[in-house]
């Protein structure tokens, strides 16, 4: 068997050089019978939920946001007076198919305006920044029934996927070159071992994705989420591919020049929405049973700052997309935007716990019981999962 594989794929603790010394970790792969798939997308930096999803019905909104409030006619109406910024217009298609949940006034359970602490809590699933180093996605792999496997579509390993379960990683970055003859010898070495051979072939399949994307000019730059979403879809639809994935995008810390319609944030949200639409299209028939969750570590201040942006806040917005959504809706217990209703008189007040949302998503996507969901999110037994979100 001759293999023309020039690029080096690396996964968590796994490289082709490590294969030669039997350093390959035990990576568990999904079978054709597994239908549940989850992609967790972390927007690092704290994106402005009030800009992304405007509560046009709130009488305080336009006075409060001033220069960062778009005209109502420029927004994409959803329901109950909530509307999307124009950049998120591609999500309207998900909405019309009953595949979109818009989450608002949502926050992690710990009050912080620190990126480091906020991301740590969101990725570990805990209620404080100190504690287990394991990520909640890795714990999910421990409680899921049947075969399962995880992958990070990122330059590094997100904390959400770290833990006792071995997972793979894929990045479009060039990680080195391996001679074809070396790969041929590795194939001969491992073809007699079913487990090692399967992992080796899966690694090469992930490498092929990178080569194909490079040939198409879609290397997955930070400014082009669509390329990474297409890669995620290709990896997850491969026979035996992963069914739990983590992705991340930075650049959401908009302290200055945030803009409104057509501005910096609106354009960045447009690239995200285009990527999500591309992912759905690339999944094909396997979109059925797939769920995508988009969250950020915190929202932004309700009032603009003096440099045309917003500062670190508390509650914000997020999204759940998937075929298993019960029905499209805006999920919130709206707290209001009057001064007395703001958290510490500056931020959108939190009324929705990220863990409650995620428990409901996991139950609907992987048929987890409440007890299993509590194992994914330790010390959260008092947080009721939103089981009604998914079918």
Predicted regions mapped to residue ranges:
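Metal-dependent active-site segment of extracytoplasmic phospho-/sulfohydrolases and closely related
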Residues: 276, 280-307
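Feature for exported/extracytoplasmic and membrane-associated proteins, marking the mature portion
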Residues: 1-285, 317-391
């Amino acid at each position: 068997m001759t293999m023309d594989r020039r690029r080096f794929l690396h996964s968590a603790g796994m490289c082709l050089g490590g294969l030669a010394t039997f350093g390959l970790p035990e990576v568990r792969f999904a079978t054709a019978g597994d239908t549940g798939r989850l992609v967790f997308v972390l927007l690092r930096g704290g994106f402005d939920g009030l800009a992304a999803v405007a509560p046009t019905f709130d009488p305080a909104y336009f006075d409060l946001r001033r220069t960062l409030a778009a005209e109502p006619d420029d927004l994409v109406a959803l329901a109950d007076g909530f509307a999307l910024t124009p950049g998120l217009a591609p999500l309207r298609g998900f909405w019309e198919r009953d595949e979109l949940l818009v989450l608002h006034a949502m926050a992690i359970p710990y009050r912080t305006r620190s990126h480091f602490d906020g991301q740590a809590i969101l990725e570990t699933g805990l209620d404080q920044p100190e504690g287990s180093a394991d990520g909640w996605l890795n714990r999910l792999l421990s409680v899921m029934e049947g075969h399962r496997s995880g992958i990070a579509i990122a330059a590094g390993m997100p904390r959400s996927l770290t833990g006792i379960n071995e997972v793979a990683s894929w990045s479009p970055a060039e990680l080195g070159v391996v001679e074809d003859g070396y790969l041929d010898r590795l194939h001969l070495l491992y073809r007699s071992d079913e487990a090692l051979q399967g992992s080796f072939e899966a690694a090469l399949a992930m490498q092929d994705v990178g080569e194909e994307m490079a040939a198409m000019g879609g290397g997955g730059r930070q400014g082009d989420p669509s390329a990474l979403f297409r890669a995620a879809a290709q990896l997850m639809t491969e026979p035996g591919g992963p069914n739990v994935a983590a992705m991340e995008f930075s650049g959401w810390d908009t302290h200055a020049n945030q803009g409104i319609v057509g501005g910096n944030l609106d354009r960045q949200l447009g690239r995200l929405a285009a990527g999500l639409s591309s992912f759905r299209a690339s999944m094909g028939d396997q979109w059925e049973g797939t769920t995508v969750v988009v969250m950020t570590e915190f929202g932004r201040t309700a009032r603009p700052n003096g440099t045309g942006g917003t500062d670190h806040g508390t509650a914000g917005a997020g999204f759940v997309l998937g075929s298993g959504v019960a029905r499209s809706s805006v999920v919130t217990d709206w707290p209001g935007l009057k001064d007395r209703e703001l958290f510490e008189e500056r931020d959108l007040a939190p009324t929705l716990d990220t863990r409650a949302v995620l428990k409901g998503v996991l139950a609907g996507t992987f048929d987890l019981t409440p007890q299993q969901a509590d194992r994914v999110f330790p010390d959260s037994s008092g947080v009721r999962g939103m089981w009604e979100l998914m079918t």
